[in-house]
Amino acid sequence: MELFSIRIQRTFQLVSTIEAYDENDLKCELGTFFPSLQAYVYRAAGEIYAILGEQDKATEFYIKSQYYSIQLKSDFDGVKSGIVYSFRSVSIYSLSDLISNTITVCHPSKMNDPFDSLFLLWSSESNLNRICKNNAHIKPFSDSFQYFKIRSFVGNKKLSLDNNLIRKVVMWSHYADAHKGFCIRYKLSTVFIKQAQGNGYSHKYLKRVHYLSKNEKCDILTKKKDTNSLFIWKSTEWKYENEIRLISYDPSCKDDHLQIPLDKNSMIEAIYFGYRCVESNVKNIMQILGEGVQYFKMDYDPNNVYKLKVNKILYKDYIDT
């Protein structure tokens, strides 16, 4: 008991020191140098508060721990701007992003594959109860994960322009409503690629998905999992996607979806309309975005019908000016 009291005292001394910096808006600068220390201290404080029965306080400190645990995690820190692609069906949700100039992230439970992210399986209360001896901290710790949201894109290793990604028939079939949808080409600034925000302990960053080989196994029975790894490992069956993930952590949003505004240096550069996208949808999207965006229409290649062609189309040919 005496050792536990000493641990409490030392942990709270460190918490007081770190919070003093946080309150003076120095958290991001400090996080650049030793984010692992903040993550560890806040997590220890969360565990202590949970043992003391203060669940709300425990959740508060676990949230702060999550913020620091994902610092310095972007795969593209040296990229000044990056190109990513998003295949979409024509829906109220996809059109809303175009109208509001936002990118919507969602809770991993809303993704099409229930095994899409280790996050859901490992951080569940049932799994944590299975692998942890003490369970006082499990609910607040598990609750701190609910504010993670993700958005999937397609991109190459350098985040550069790549029409080969657009020509993949399977992507149009699976993610663009059987070629009736469209694909957005985004240019994202370095600020959008990785950004920690002020007082709200929110953070977002781009990460490349890694695919496990057929001989590799991925278990959820390990006590310690790097938060980063919970979002980036997928089965090798998905390797064809070339997936890039935008991972967002925002404790201020309790909904399953969050619209993130594009900053002034990020933009929609181009729209690619699917081979079966009807003209009314083409016109509607053009009217939303205007003439400042490039437009293309997918078509089959008569020399190879299993490979798509990218044909440029003009705004003025569809919209009366």
What kind of feature is each model-predicted range?
Residues 44, 60-321:
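Partner-binding and oligomerization surfaces adjacent to conserved cores of proteins
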Residues 21-29, 69:
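Alpha-helical junction/boundary sensor with strong preference for TPR arrays
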